[in-house]
Amino acid sequence: MYRANYVPAAKDPMVYLVSHTWANRFEKGRRRATIEAYSNCDSVLLYNDLTNEKATFLGRKKNNGTGTHFMWENRDIRYNVLRAVGYYKGKPVAEDLILLNGLEQAPNFELLYQDDKKILKGEAGYNYLYRLNCGGDDYTDSFGQLWLQDNTNYSRSWAENFKDLNPYLASQRTTNDPIHGTRDWTLFQHFRFGRHQLEYRFPVADGTYRIELYFTEPWHGTGGSASTDCEGLRIFDVAVNDSVVLDDLDIWAESGHDGVCKKIVYTTAVSYTHLTLPTN
């Protein structure tokens, strides 16, 4: 990775575990394996849990210079969490974490839920017409609320303009990272992305509507440090029926990497049969 080799740790320390897209690597259960990481730090410590306990410590590796990376060979991987901590001048400065399917839950796994903001709980006094799991399937959250599958009944993207293309092509992704601020990771781990041709349309009667929008930044900031700054790297607007309701939204600035971001807007749909939410 470029940053691991050519960005000094003094400027922007980082560590990246290989790989965030290989969650099923241990789907058949516990076994020994080689774990790799990229970092510009002086050394990296590897753990099989959320804490620094000796029982789940997998070893410390030193930085051997440009063109090399960190490797822990023949390690016993027992739990479903791998966590790498990068050290610079003797201090922990960067951290990365991946979740693995098929393994026993890490002893301190519940720490990943400690900042649950319960932001999905429906507001009292409101009748919710739609809840949609953007990019995902039907999902019932921790409050018993059903979020509908994202399908072409509601969403539109660029691929629909081309015959025989999957309508979700290059506008739908998933992440296996834990999501900070909620227990309902699944709802945020499936998502849509795109530019001006991504939109949602919902049939409604005339009236004033309260719209709750939920976001996360799944890419920028992975494996970074407290000094990592991704502000301004992804900025977009959200409109309702051609009127901008969120201008220059920067999810990183709102909630950082893999954090939940909630926005509430109010709009009046007069003489419309749909609420249309495009992004740009």
Map each language-model feature to its residues:
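Substrate-binding clefts and catalytic carboxylate motifs of secreted carbohydrate-active enzymes
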Residues: 1-118, 122-126
